[in-house]
């Protein structure tokens, strides 16, 4: 890596430490939620042009019909665009995106990037709730700005707890993952925990810089409180059902217990996945 490239990365990381992350995200959130026709049309057009958004696969193909940028960003897809693998033993991708990392949880640590990892206990935010996932399996899926931003169930289960964990709002791209220790266990997140026929399963929705919010079907849109909030539920969700959505991009991490599943060998870091695609299978 050249000196210039290293310097750019260092400045990018330092800038994130200096920027008032939550205040910036709140400002962006207000713009994203605005229903002012001129403002929302301008923002949607700029975003659509920059990221090459394909609205032909969206349920609503007319960008002017969305009531706000948030409405556009969390757009639904047409029926049949994403097919959920129906094999009973399939573990499917919870989202459209790219795999950041995938594999085993070793010594209670989840691999983040070269030279970086974090504890599953810190990720979950509660030692007792994290215990079943020690030495288990994980997959981290990064949703880029151009992706479909709803998160779905990787396997059928009963939602038993949601745990809001306050935190920072670093960017979650590859540069940050390689340079910010414990990134996903430091950022604000919503932990969703399930009982399944395989035992415990977790889906963690991780926030990021300028992410205007996280929403789940059980809690609605999360209102940051600055403190850990545990809620109990008993909500059955089938594989492929919508679990939540991001208002601007971020990351979903799925966790399973030890010796319950195996990932398909073709998947590795940077592999592209789509929601409903088979990523693994039960043992």
UniProtKB/Swiss-Prot annotation:
GO BP, one annotated term: phosphatidylethanolamine biosynthetic process
Predominant location category: membrane
Residues where Pyruvic acid (Ser) is found: 250
Keywords tagged on the record: Cell membrane, Decarboxylase, Lipid biosynthesis, Lipid metabolism, Lyase, Membrane, Phospholipid biosynthesis, Phospholipid metabolism, Pyruvate, Zymogen
EC numbers for this chain: 4.1.1.65
Record: active site: 96 (charge relay system), 152 (charge relay system), 250 (charge relay system), 250 (schiff-base intermediate with substrate)
Disulfide pairings: none
Cofactor binding note: Binds 1 pyruvoyl group covalently per subunit.
Names of the cofactor(s): pyruvate
Assigned GO CC terms: plasma membrane
Post-translational modification: Is synthesized initially as an inactive proenzyme. Formation of the active enzyme involves a self-maturation process in which the active site pyruvoyl group is generated from an internal serine residue via an autocatalytic post-translational modification. Two non-identical subunits are generated from the proenzyme in this reaction, and the pyruvate is formed at the N-terminus of the alpha chain, which is derived from the carboxyl end of the proenzyme.
Catalysed reaction equations from the record: a 1,2-diacyl-sn-glycero-3-phospho-L-serine + H(+) = a 1,2-diacyl-sn-glycero-3-phosphoethanolamine + CO2
Subcellular localization: Cell membrane
Annotated site (Cleavage (non-hydrolytic)): 249-250
Membrane topology of this protein: Peripheral membrane protein
UniProt-listed InterPro entries: PS_Dcarbxylase (IPR003817), PSD-B (IPR033177), PSD_type1_pro (IPR033178)
Function statement: Catalyzes the formation of phosphatidylethanolamine (PtdEtn) from phosphatidylserine (PtdSer).
Similarity comment: Belongs to the phosphatidylserine decarboxylase family. PSD-B subfamily. Prokaryotic type I sub-subfamily.
Protein name per the record: Phosphatidylserine decarboxylase proenzyme
Species in which this protein is naturally found: Acinetobacter baumannii (strain SDF)
Protein encoded by which gene: psd
């Amino acid at each position: 890596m050249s000196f210039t490239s290293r310097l750019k990365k260092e400045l990018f990381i330092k800038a994130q430490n200096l920027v008032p992350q939550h205040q910036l995200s709140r400002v962006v959130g207000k713009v994203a939620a605005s229903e002012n026709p001129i403002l929302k049309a301008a923002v949607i057009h700029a975003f659509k042009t920059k990221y090459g958004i394909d609205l032909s696969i969206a349920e609503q193909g007319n960008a002017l019909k969305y009531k706000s940028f948030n409405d556009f960003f969390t757009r639904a897809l047409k029926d049949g665009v994403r097919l959920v693998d129906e094999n009973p033993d399939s573990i499917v991708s919870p989202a459209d995106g790219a795999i950041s990392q995938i594999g085993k949880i070793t010594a209670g640590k989840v691999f983040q990037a070269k030279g970086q990892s974090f504890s599953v206990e810190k990720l979950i935010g509660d030692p007792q709730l994290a215990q079943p996932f020690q030495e288990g399996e994980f997959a981290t899926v990064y949703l880029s700005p151009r992706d479909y931003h709803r998160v779905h169930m990787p396997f059928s289960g009963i939602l038993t707890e949601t745990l809001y964990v306050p935190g920072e709002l670093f960017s979650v791209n590859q540069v940050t993952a390689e340079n910010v220790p414990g990134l996903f266990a430091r950022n604000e997140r919503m932990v969703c925990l399930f009982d399944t026929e395989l035992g415990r399963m977790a889906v963690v929705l991780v926030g990021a810089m300028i992410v205007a919010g996280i929403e789940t079907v059980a809690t609605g849109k999360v209102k940051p409180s600055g403190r850990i909030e545990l809620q109990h539920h008993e909500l059955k969700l089938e594989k492929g059902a919508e679990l939540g959505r991001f208002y601007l991009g971020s990351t979903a991490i799925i966790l399973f217990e030890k010796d319950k599943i195996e990932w398909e060998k073709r998947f590795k870091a940077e592999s592209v996945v789509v929601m409903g695609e088979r990523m693994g299978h039960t043992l």
